[in-house]
């Protein structure tokens, strides 16, 4: 990510009266050479680490619709107050995020359904996944099944090798931009450093076209 678009260089309010706000903030984010367009067009190739390529994938179909730059600045300030390096703050954020996802459990627009947590937890307990195995959901939505699997697998982590297996334990695919973004965030909240969820249509590729690496 270019230096000017890193959070610390534009979002943090240093209380010196220089923080971006109002129309200036909206232009910085939405402009032709702004934040969103830059992240949508980051150079990515087959050798790009997953932790970097995921940024382009997340922003590829996203737009920023807020019209009030002052309100947007207030939201940014609230987010910046969260210390993601602090276990308590991270846990609190995770609880809030879980609450947001619960609000999406009823049927949404276009016939979308969000699977209740109780059901995903039950199915994972039935499957009994083990570290070293892969747990996949290829219509992953907001990541409910994957995070239930992570909660189950996290209890098995005892060593550094276990932690590495935990980081690579789940894979997913999701076509719609909003659920995809929510699923990425959901895995980050569950301590997955580079979520392996692809932004693609699982039904668009024939089984015979998959390679061994896939």
State each model region's role.
Residues 112-213:
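Conserved S-adenosyl-L-methionine
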Residues 1-131, 196-207:
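Non-catalytic, mostly N-terminal accessory regions of nucleic-acid modification and defense proteins
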Residues 1, 213-214:
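Internal hydrophobic scaffold segments of catalytic domains
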């Amino acid at each position: 990510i270019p230096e000017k678009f890193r959070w610390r260089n534009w979002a943090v309010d240093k209380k010196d009266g220089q923080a971006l706000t109002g129309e200036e903030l909206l232009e910085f984010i939405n402009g032709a050479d702004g934040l969103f367009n830059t992240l949508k067009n980051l150079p990515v190739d087959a050798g790009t680490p997953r932790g970097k390529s995921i940024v382009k994938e997340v922003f590829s179909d996203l737009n920023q619709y807020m019209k009030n730059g002052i309100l947007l600045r207030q939201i940014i300030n609230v987010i910046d107050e969260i210390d993601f390096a602090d276990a308590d703050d991270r846990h609190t954020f995770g609880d809030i995020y879980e609450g947001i996802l619960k609000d999406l459990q009823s049927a949404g627009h276009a016939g979308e359904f969000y699977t209740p947590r109780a059901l995903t937890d039950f199915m994972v307990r039935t499957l009994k996944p083990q570290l070293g195995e892969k747990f996949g959901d290829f219509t992953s939505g907001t990541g409910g099944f994957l995070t239930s699997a992570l909660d189950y697998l996290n209890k098995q982590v005892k060593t550094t090798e276990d932690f590495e297996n935990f980081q690579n334990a789940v894979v997913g695919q999701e076509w719609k931009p909003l659920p995809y973004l929510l699923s990425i965030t959901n895995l980050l909240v569950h301590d997955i450093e580079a979520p392996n969820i692809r932004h693609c249509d699982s039904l668009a590729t024939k089984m015979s076209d998959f390679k061994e690496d896939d």
